[in-house]
């Protein structure tokens, strides 16, 4: 799978949909006061970039070497000691994880204080089919309740949750994952009810979790 992401690396680095966003601003806001951070599944490196601009010492991590991370490793097996970073963040990547529960537990393990996650919300099976057809590396989006359970199971207390509508341009969304021909037409059919002009309405969730301390 990493070879697929190596091929997509430049598209994600230059993607307007990934370079900016309310969730990106929120992750930076929530990390105020932290000194060190880990950006899990960094992709185009946008969280790492914004964290560095905010003055944090950042390590970026991704399973695909083509994304040019500081460390090449999967989210489910982070090569760091417990409590290595003040904050661990993961933006719009968890829906690709084969074992999201293990990944959240790993993020909590290497975090000293905070785990911050943003991702697209589960919007029904039709939306899931559209995501899988558009991008076969898609595993699943999760509901707010599922995210809260994942955080709790990793020893994280959810302090803040923010959800919002995140519109993305349809055709660049398809192109970014190499979706063409009949597959692209099928996706257009599946998302027809979520279109506002040339944009698809996605729902996004951001969660701020604080690591529990004994006692």
Segments the model singles out, each with a brief description of its role:
Residues 1-33, 46-50, 165, 171-174:
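Conserved class I S-adenosyl-L-methionine
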Residues 38-77:
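Class I SAM-dependent methyltransferase SAM/SAH-binding core
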Residues 44, 159-215:
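Conserved Class I S-adenosyl-L-methionine
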Residues 89:
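A conserved beta-strand element that flanks and buttresses the S-adenosyl-L-methionine
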Residues 92-93:
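Short catalytic micro-motifs in class I SAM-dependent methyltransferases
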Residues 101-115:
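A short glycine-rich, Lys/Arg-flanked "PGG" loop and its adjoining helix->strand segment in the class I
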Residues 140-155:
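Short alpha-helix
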């Amino acid at each position: 799978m990493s070879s697929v992401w190596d091929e997509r690396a430049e598209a994600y680095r230059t993607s307007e949909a990934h370079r900016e966003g309310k969730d990106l601003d929120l992750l930076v806001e929530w990390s105020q006061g932290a000194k060190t951070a880990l950006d899990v599944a960094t992709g185009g490196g946008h969280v790492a970039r914004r964290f560095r601009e905010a003055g944090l010492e950042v390590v970026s991590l991704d399973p695909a070497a083509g994304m040019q991370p500081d460390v090449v490793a999967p989210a489910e097996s982070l090569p760091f000691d417990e409590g290595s970073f003040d904050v661990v963040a993961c933006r719009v990547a968890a829906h690709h994880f084969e074992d999201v529960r293990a990944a959240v537990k790993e993020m909590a393990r290497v975090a000293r204080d905070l785990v911050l996650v943003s991702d697209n919300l589960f919007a029904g099976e039709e939306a899931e089919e559209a995501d899988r057809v558009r991008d076969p590396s898609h595993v699943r989006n999760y509901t707010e309740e599922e995210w809260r359970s994942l955080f709790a199971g990793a020893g994280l207390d959810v302090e803040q949750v923010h959800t919002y509508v995140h519109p993305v341009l349809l055709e660049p969304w398809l192109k970014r994952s190499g979706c063409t021909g009949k597959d692209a037409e099928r996706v257009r059919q599946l998302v027809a009810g979520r279109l506002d002009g040339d944009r698809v309405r996605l729902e996004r969730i951001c969660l701020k979790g604080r690591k529990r301390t004994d006692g």
